[in-house]
Amino acid sequence: MFNAPRPMASSYSYTDPLSNSAAAGAAFGELDPWSSAPSPAGSVTPARATASASEGRNIAANGNKEEGLNGLINDPPALYVSLLDQLDTSGTGEVSLAAVHRLLGTSKLPAVVVEKIIHLTSRDKSTLTRPEFFCALALVSLAQSSPDPNDISIEKLSFSLSNLPLPKLKPSDPPSVSSGVAASTAAATGFNAWDGTINKGTTYSANNSTFRSTDPMVDNAEDRWWKDQERIVVTLIPEKEGWFLQKYRIESDKRGEGPVARRYSDFVWLMDVLEKRYPFRILPPLPPKRINPSSAFLEARRLALIRLLSFLTAHPVLRTDACLNIFLTSSSFESWRKRTPVSTDEESLSKKLTTAQEMSIPSDLELKLDNLRERLPAMLGHYTRLVVMAERSLVRLQVQAAEAARMAMSTQSIGELVPRCCWRSVQGDDGESGRGVARECGLCEGVGRGWGDVGDGWVSVGEELEKGVQLLQKHIESLKSQRDLYSSFHALFYRHNKLSLDNVDVLRKRVDSRFSKIESLKSAKKPGWEGEVDKLASQSDRDTAEIQRLLARRVFVRACMWHELSVVFHSMQAAQGTMGWKDFVKDQKERTKRLNGVWQGLEETLESMPLE
């Protein structure tokens, strides 16, 4: 049944909010994600179709009605907002159809009325937006306060707004997932491949010109780092500064005394500093910026920022950077930036390699790097396709959850109507008593209860599918973290090719030329030759010192590339793939077992459903 669901509006059209701009109908990845084109403006009124759409147009024709309905949506009662916050835990502004059905099921309205309310507000979509959700709550109030709950419509709602009571609902807890996913989604995403704790020996020093870590370069992988990873939580603060500036609340379980607020520009500043300090380290990609972003774009960027900070706090060198520590802990970050000059010198100027570190660099390092460089584009392409296919699967799973909720509503409505359709429910002339009576039919009553049990079964199926959506979202973030690792090393190769170049050969030729000139001046011994020789010798000494510094930088760059390849990339690649897929298989196995339990329980319940 669900293998080939019917086409529905906005059900299967997947677009990556961080990869596509607002152009409608564009193929995946065709447009520049850094484009400043505004996002499409979301609808401010509930989406309705056919009959309900015509009612909406009739309302629009009357200015007072339009103003009243929009007034409810734009300035809803506190209860409406509270219910939305309980169901929309991720802050996307949308609520799943299954969650809305569970909430409306506590209204004590007939199943037929609940189905009609959801039909008026959602039609064929798998989620309800904020305006649609508020409209559904208002329809519940209208149905509860009307003599005939079935006699509801958008037009009647508009006429009744002035004296509309609050809905009587008892929200239940959202379906919980397994303990492995019980932590917040934000904390569970962004797979950390290194222990994020700061070593006790790490110190941070600051003066008028510098602010950097004094911790030496780590050259060995840490044991069992995945047992105690640093968890980073990033949430979008609803309030804005100005008309387009969003702030993010950042919290770490291992640093600081509480959450801190940061703007997107602060992330840009941090990555700019880290790229200048650590050009030969793996740096995670920074998500793009967009003017007038959509809610989907903001949510995708929030998750990308979690992955970025999780990677930085997992990296054995970057996690000890003092600027990163201040970024994650300082409550007055903006004032600190203004009063503290931050050094952006390369780490090679402040860190020296030990003899053991220099000797650990393999002589065939270039061959090892070339081997990865040749295969990196293919790996990156495969991971990109995996992410796209997983997100398409997520859309299909969301549609299945919505369809299960619709199946539950329809079957429960049928269960209520079956006994009423029986001929025995009609009052007639009883030959024996001579008066009209309506008799109960045991067969139809039993069949109706069976239909109700089937509806309850579909409710359970919808809840399990919703849990599956949450699990799949977590594993998609794991896949994106793995993809980001390959993308980050690809960017590292680009920086290495660009920034590892030096002018040692030019300086050597210049020193050799001066040496020859000095020898000729000494042989000629013309007047004033001593001063000219001293001048040339001083210049040669400066160039020789620069050559020594650049040669030491070459060795340091090679050590960095070897460390990133053999320790960071090698360990992260293995751990992310192994643990990510193990968790995925375990979650899928448990979800399948729970679904089988639902069907088995329904099978046992339907044994008592009468046939005749």
UniProtKB/Swiss-Prot annotation:
<dbReference type="GO" id="GO:0034498">
    <property type="term" value="P:early endosome to Golgi transport"/>
</dbReference>
<protein>
    <recommendedName>
        <fullName>Sorting nexin MVP1</fullName>
    </recommendedName>
</protein>
<dbReference type="InterPro" id="IPR036871">
    <property type="entry name" value="PX_dom_sf"/>
</dbReference>
<keyword id="KW-0963">Cytoplasm</keyword>
<dbReference type="GO" id="GO:0005829">
    <property type="term" value="C:cytosol"/>
</dbReference>
<keyword id="KW-0653">Protein transport</keyword>
<dbReference type="Pfam" id="PF00787">
    <property type="entry name" value="PX"/>
</dbReference>
<dbReference type="InterPro" id="IPR045734">
    <property type="entry name" value="Snx8_BAR_dom"/>
</dbReference>
<feature type="binding site">
    <location>
        <position position="263"/>
    </location>
    <ligand>
        <name>a 1,2-diacyl-sn-glycero-3-phospho-(1D-myo-inositol-3-phosphate)</name>
    </ligand>
</feature>
<comment type="function">
    <text>Required for vacuolar protein sorting.</text>
</comment>
<feature type="region of interest" description="Disordered">
    <location>
        <begin position="35"/>
        <end position="68"/>
    </location>
</feature>
<feature type="binding site">
    <location>
        <position position="301"/>
    </location>
    <ligand>
        <name>a 1,2-diacyl-sn-glycero-3-phospho-(1D-myo-inositol-3-phosphate)</name>
    </ligand>
</feature>
<dbReference type="Pfam" id="PF19566">
    <property type="entry name" value="Snx8_BAR_dom"/>
</dbReference>
<dbReference type="GO" id="GO:0006886">
    <property type="term" value="P:intracellular protein transport"/>
</dbReference>
<dbReference type="InterPro" id="IPR001683">
    <property type="entry name" value="PX_dom"/>
</dbReference>
<keyword id="KW-0813">Transport</keyword>
<dbReference type="GO" id="GO:0035091">
    <property type="term" value="F:phosphatidylinositol binding"/>
</dbReference>
<dbReference type="InterPro" id="IPR028662">
    <property type="entry name" value="SNX8/Mvp1"/>
</dbReference>
<dbReference type="InterPro" id="IPR035704">
    <property type="entry name" value="SNX8/Mvp1_PX"/>
</dbReference>
<dbReference type="GO" id="GO:0031901">
    <property type="term" value="C:early endosome membrane"/>
</dbReference>
<feature type="binding site">
    <location>
        <position position="265"/>
    </location>
    <ligand>
        <name>a 1,2-diacyl-sn-glycero-3-phospho-(1D-myo-inositol-3-phosphate)</name>
    </ligand>
</feature>
<keyword id="KW-0472">Membrane</keyword>
<feature type="binding site">
    <location>
        <position position="289"/>
    </location>
    <ligand>
        <name>a 1,2-diacyl-sn-glycero-3-phospho-(1D-myo-inositol-3-phosphate)</name>
    </ligand>
</feature>
<feature type="domain" description="PX">
    <location>
        <begin position="226"/>
        <end position="334"/>
    </location>
</feature>
<dbReference type="InterPro" id="IPR011992">
    <property type="entry name" value="EF-hand-dom_pair"/>
</dbReference>
<comment type="similarity">
    <text>Belongs to the sorting nexin family.</text>
</comment>
